[in-house]
Design a protein with these regions (language model features):
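Short alpha-helix capping/helix-loop boundary micro-motifs
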Residues: 23-27
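Conserved hydrophobic positions within beta-strands
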Residues: 14, 39-41
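Intrinsically disordered, low-complexity, charged/polar segments
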Residues: 2-5, 66
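C-terminal structural segments of small proteins and small subunits
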Residues: 41-70
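Short, acidic/hydrophobic/Gly-rich beta-strand patch recurrent on exposed beta strands
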Residues: 14-16, 30-32, 50-52
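Short, conserved catalytic or interaction motifs in soluble domains
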Residues: 19
Length: 70
């Protein structure tokens, strides 16, 4: 499932990043978002998700959330 389908407050392990866009993949990697890393959806607001990775919080749009498979 992708982060769009993930439940708020539950910790997941990232299985893969599904994108052919190298810039998007590089951006997610710079956030610490890569296979094997733990991730939590903190909250959702319309088209954005607030996620927690490595004790840091980020707001990402639905396109980024759709690329993250947990």
């Amino acid at each position: 499932m992708t982060l769009i389908e993930a439940q708020e407050g539950q910790e997941y392990t990232i299985q893969q990043i599904q994108t052919n866009d190298e810039e998007l993949n590089s951006f997610l990697f710079s956030l610490g978002c890569y296979s094997g890393e733990k991730i939590t959806v903190v909250s959702r607001k319309k088209s954005n998700c607030v996620i927690s990775i490595k004790e840091a919080r980020y707001s990402i749009d639905s396109q980024l959330a759709q690329a993250i498979v947990v």
